Amino acid sequence: MNGNLGQLVMVTRAEEAEGFPPLLAEMLWRGNFSRRPEYSVFARGLGPGMVDYVATVFIPRRFVERVMEAHNISAHGTSIEMAIQEVAYKAMARCECV
């Protein structure tokens, strides 16, 4: 999966974060997902002093009522926190959890 994402710099469940990560966790909990989403953040150098962060989140398919495709979503940001916020937002917009 790490193809050209860069160097892994962090894996987190973003439990202390504010903004979209706790909203995504709440949305998934209400949709009968049993675990908080886990975010992986990769860093890729773009030039002198320039780093592109790519956060990914994997949301497994749900086994309650109907089958849903698993989602592997990624987003870019200029900081680790921004990339996590962006990927959580994209996951909320893309998932049909509730």
Describe each region flagged by the PLM.
Residues 1-70, 77-85, 89-98:
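N-terminal segment of the canonical double-stranded RNA-binding domain
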